[in-house]
Amino acid sequence: MTPIVFGGRFGWLHVGHGSHGVVLCNPFGHEEAWGHKAMRYLAEELSRRGIPVLRFDYLATGDSVGIDHESDRVDHFIVDIGAAIERLRQETGVTKVTLCGLRLGGTLAALASHHPLVDSLALLAPVVNGRHYLRELTALRQTWVENLPVVVRAVQVDSPYHVLGQVYSEAFRSRLSGLDLGKAMSHQSALPKRVFVADLRPGASRSLCNVLLDRGVDVQTEAFDDYFEFMQETASSVLPEKTLKRAAQWIEEGVAEGMARDLKPARARKAARPSMSDDAIIETPEAIERPVIFGAAGLFGILCEPRDGLPGGPVIVITNTAGSVHQGDSRLSVRMAREMAQRGIASLRFDARGIGDSPARSPDGTHDTVASIHAQTTIEDVATAAAWLKRKGYDNVVVFGICSGAYSALRASLIEPAIGAVIAVNLQRFHVPEHLTLQELRAQRRNTMARLGPAILKPQKWWLVLSGKRGLKPILKAFASNAAARLQSQMPGVTRKKVVQADHGSLTDPHSIVHALERKGVRTLLVYGAGDEGLDQLNAHFGRHGKKLSRTTRVRAAVCGDVDHALYDTRALATVIAMSDTFIKDLKPESAPVMEPIAPLGVSPQL
């Protein structure tokens, strides 16, 4: 697959040799990050079958240019799909195109299917009724708000309206509320010959299918059986291989039928861009962004450099949060990178192995069906990214991460000399055994002091224990562990000997890790939202809100009342960006930088 940029839109071209191609249309908002691995998997599955594919980000989404909360975007997205069709034709010579979309992407694909090259549609759990879709979004937002710590919940506002970080303008919501895909398709001037629909519930797309059938379209419907295991936060999401392979098979069958009908099939170029071109540049008002491939594993990232920045200077490595692609949940990492560029600071947002657009973790290229969010390979890849940037001449490499991304940032700083500073937001633990499953980790989080403390005063909680519905042993173990940590925090000298003797990468004790950061000279800022469960370990080992870290010279903690766990609230992201800007500009460069230019085609030498 090859990264390309067209009209400010970032995309990936997957090679094929036929005259029939596919354009994949992304879902929107939080579902874009949740659905990314499925879209990549489908593109690769089609490419293996010899079908050229273009998957891309609409303007104002993903890595493309544009601000993501401006006005109503529906018509703009339809134009973007038309531009993608034309670019696929130019690159590969295809004469027919299938549009395939997931969720709102399926809706947009249908609305764009009047394009003369489009002969078929594959719709995966399409949004057929806009009002129902908005109700789903509202329910999801309400669930998120209800699960916030009380302090953070109290400061939430309804405007700007956002769902898991994606802002929806009033104009956009108004447009969505009036969306009836069946009605829209009944008035569309031209329709494709064939349509495949994978429904998340039986009959969910009946109104649309009836309209298409009445207008003579060949419609095939199937159940999206693995939808609900798939469409959830990336840490838990399971790749829906069954449905994706069925969709690819249906598309391939249509391609074969078309070739059989055409006595003289159009010839298409067999290959499309075997490597990155130097025109794959994303230009925004504040930055120049380039796709880069680096390291022995061929990791992928976007290097974002300020337009007016001087050579060298500080640079931020923005890590993956859970299994989310380098763009971040609801485009958070893109917004942060471009905001920091406006402040004169460069950044690299990249994907570790097994995540986003980087290679799989497995040597045989097999994709993980479920993300491994605390994998040692992720820590190694963060270290590789930092070392690569240091070689490029940046004087201070700062690694930034949220939750599991904070963990990989912190752990990488223990093993990579190139890392000069770390900004860890809502770090849950200083050490997570790699063998610990996500389910086991979540079970342990049920017994944090933030949850157990208030529960002690609630009789109904004790009734769960007395009735056997909640185990007493894990609760007692949690209290004992917390008490032991607090006792140890009164004797800071106990762990110093371990730091000298142990390999920094294998350290497990929070005190030893902090002492190692001190010895290595890594400036560290630990940022927490008020009430975040990560405070449990910080408070136990370093006093309330980490006050005992004042004994150190390089490690500090800050607790903010308006910061939610994932920085979905736009004000929380703004707060953390401002703190990061101040922190980075206070760093002292080690030496004058000597810049190594980015290699031709955007592909950087392997380390």
Give the role of each language-model region.
Residues 100-109, 125, 400-409:
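Gly/Ala-rich beta-loop-alpha elbow adjacent to hydrolase catalytic centers
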Residues 91-103, 390-403:
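Alpha/beta-hydrolase fold nucleophile elbow
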Residues 16-57, 306-352, 361:
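Short, surface-exposed "cap/lid" segments of acyl-processing enzymes
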Residues 225-284, 561-607:
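Catalytic active-site module of serine/aspartate enzymes centered on a nucleophile-bearing elbow/loop
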Residues 57-72, 350-370:
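Glycine-rich "HGGG/HGxG" loop immediately N-terminal to the catalytic nucleophile
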Residues 1-20, 253-314, 569:
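N-terminal cap/lid segment of alpha/beta-hydrolase-fold proteins
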Residues 72, 117-248, 373, 418-577, ...:
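The alpha/beta-hydrolase serine catalytic core
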